[in-house]
Amino acid sequence: MVNAPLAAPLTSPYTRPVADTSPGIDDEAQQLFTAGRYYATRRTAEGLRQAIERLERAVALKPDFAAAWAELADCYALLNWFIEPPPPEAWQRAKHAALSAVSADPLLAEAHASLGFVRLHYDRNWKDAEHELRKAIVLNARNLVSHRWYAYSLSAMGRHEEAITEIERAREISPQSPVIATAVANVLFLAGRFDDAIRQCHKALALDPGGVAAHTILRWAYEKKGMVPEALAAFEQERVFAGETPTTRAKRAHVLAATGHLEQAREILADIISERSEKWVTAYEIAIIYSLLNDRDNAFFWLHTADQEHAVGFTFARVDPHLDNLRSDPRFGELLRSTNQS
């Protein structure tokens, strides 16, 4: 087993403030926590696995180690972005860890942020998510993650101006963070402000030219603007930095459908669905592609699948511009009501 540097500088743009070491924390538990955070900042599948292994050992040694529980909750939650397919128990374990963090230290901002994140994406309990994220900000107003997740929760609820204000607060705290710059672009895109999103993506990419998420949001905005050459070029940049994966292939089908290359998109989509058991792609992306192809029946089938699988993108179905083709269909309103999004 390769050991992480126990005092490695945490300079990743994803790093969030964390409570100072408490005098009573067991030395070994503290070392495991520090190593776990080091691996977690890598934001890769293997990094998250390594982080979880160490954080689980830390809380086993010190069951009231709130900061370790909060970090563990985030790692389990993030498996839903970085593992394909996500482990089916990831969200349940994230929820257990977040609740354990709050129980261990009700005044730890990170604990409430972690629980708010679970309430948003797993429980889809908007009221509780907002309560937890706002409490996290009250406890630590400089916690970037709390501001970012709260902004996303506001976007998901359709409260776009509030979301923009909230994410701008994060940018004021860390103006050079490419993660926050990308989050600003994402919030603008969800608000339908595509020109502003394009400008913001370029700012984010100036900070981190390899930021896959910024390239993705830039492509989305170009698609919505009907800027076909630009959208296709943005996808090629995505592909360069993300590599050839099943998700990248789905993104290819997405951009082809959005730019009018319908038959090519259908061919790729058929392969994606037939091979999904071996080459997993989130059901939410499949639903979006069907929406772009104006195949409503299949789009709704896959949206229901996304709900059942707790696909993270489904949290934003209410406001996602990719689903605009479906909004006039009565089934869309029924779907939102049945999933607590109306």
Where in the sequence are the language-model features?
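Beta/coil-rich, acidic/histidine-enriched accessory regions frequently appended to metallopeptidases
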Residues: 330-342
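TPR/TPR-like alpha-solenoid helical repeat scaffolds
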Residues: 248-260, 314-330
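Helix-coil-helix junctions within alpha-helical repeat/solenoid scaffolds
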Residues: 210, 214-300
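Substrate-binding/catalytic groove segments of enzymes
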Residues: 296-300, 309-315
